[in-house]
């Protein structure tokens, strides 16, 4: 699956700078050694957006309380878009007031998502528009007033990982060292023994 820099950890910058097909590693990643090949780089492949859903009677997932027609929903969506574009407007508050969607109580926040996570028309809008863009998109759920909040690049890696497990000899050596340390601390105490180590 595609990953953002934040998901990759210590070597994220190095992995993001690879050319497609290039290999990096081996490198230590937590309890694993990995070798990774960059399979694909998708600029802006993860988008953060929020929306206000204006449903209409007969739209998918519309509750029984929705009585507006499709035309009324379209007009309402463009009214909300004008309000969202107005100076001093608060998109989150508009979502709480106007949205029929499940993200209403979160101010319309959808967080980050990757290509294909949303229905096609919604997906096409957010991935083709610049950060800060506002617009109305029609889907089977109704009319969405959408704001593109942020974009992140993502990479697709093919990795081979091997868990780091100490050998029996290493485990025995650590045990012997710890036992020797314990015995040498004796009456002088832990502090003087630790300084000697």
Can you describe what each PLM-predicted range is?
Residues 15-19, 126-130:
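Soluble sensory domains of the PAS superfamily and closely related sensory modules
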Residues 87-92:
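Loop/turn elements at helix/coil->beta-strand transitions in domains of secreted/extracellular proteins
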Residues 18, 29, 139:
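Acidic surface patches and DE-rich sequence motifs
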Residues 1-14, 35-86, 100-121, 145-184, ...:
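Well-structured core secondary-structure elements of compact alpha/beta domains
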Residues 23-26, 134-136:
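PAS and PAS-like sensory modules
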């Amino acid at each position: 699956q595609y990953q953002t820099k934040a998901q990759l950890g210590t070597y994220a910058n190095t992995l993001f700078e690879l050319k497609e097909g290039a290999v990096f590693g081996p490198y230590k990643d937590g309890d694993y050694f990995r070798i990774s090949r960059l399979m694909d780089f998708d600029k802006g492949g993860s988008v953060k957006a929020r929306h206000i859903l204006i449903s209409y009677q007969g739209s998918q997932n519309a509750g029984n309380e929705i009585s507006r027609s499709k035309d009324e929903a379209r007009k309402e969506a463009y009214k909300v878009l004008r309000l969202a574009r107005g100076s001093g407007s608060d998109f989150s508050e508009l979502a709480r007031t106007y949205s029929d969607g499940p993200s209403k109580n979160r101010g319309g926040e959808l967080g980050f998502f990757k290509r294909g996570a949303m229905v096609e028309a919604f997906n096409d809008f957010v991935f083709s528009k610049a950060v800060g863009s506002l617009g109305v998109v029609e889907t089977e759920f109704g009319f969405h007033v959408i704001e593109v909040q942020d974009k992140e690049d993502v990479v697709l890696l093919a990795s081979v990982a091997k868990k780091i497990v100490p050998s029996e000899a290493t485990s025995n050596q650590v045990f012997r060292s710890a036992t020797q340390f314990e015995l040498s601390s004796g009456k002088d105490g832990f502090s003087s023994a630790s300084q000697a180590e």
